[in-house]
Amino acid sequence: MLNEEMKEVLRRNICYFATSTEDGKPNVIPVGLVEPIDNSRILLVDVKMNKTRRNLEENNAVALAVTDFEKLKAYQFKGKAKVVTEGELFEGAVKLAEERMKIRRERLERRIESESDPEMRKKVKEIAERKMKPKAAIVIEVKEVYPCM
């Protein structure tokens, strides 16, 4: 279901993760810690998904959207999600978060050096210094894929 191009688009871009309450009230959040596990599953790292986690307890039907403007590719993935808080998948989420957050900090530190606006520099510095600890891995079992571009 997921080909190599889709996997690369997921890894390189911010994704938008949609959940809903049992009665259908939607919630969408941006997610940067995303990694395809195999050809049918996608891992998201939960560092601050409070409302999303509550929604998943009520309704595990989800969608994940991503756009790569450089490659002119966009996809929507629909499926069922589960929350994992221990074991191999969770440990993989922790490792992914550590690797990606290190890269993120380095990028933000370079931006601080080049930023001329003092207020923006302060905001970027605050974001760079945040410590985000993974709370869980969210695993999406992909059932449908829709190309959007």
Give the ranges of each region predicted by the language model:
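Short beta-strand segments
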Residues: N27-I29, K73-F77
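Charged, gly/pro-rich active-site loop segments
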Residues: Y75-M149
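Ordered hydrophobic segments in well-structured contexts
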Residues: Y16, L43, A63-A65, A74-Q76, ...
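Structured loops at beta-to-helix junctions and adjacent beta-edge loops in soluble globular domains
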Residues: S20, T67, E141-K143
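N-terminal structural module
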Residues: M1-V47
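A generic local secondary-structure boundary/capping motif
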Residues: E5-K7, R53, K125-R130
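A short mixed-secondary-structure module that forms the rim of ligand-binding clefts
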Residues: L33-L72
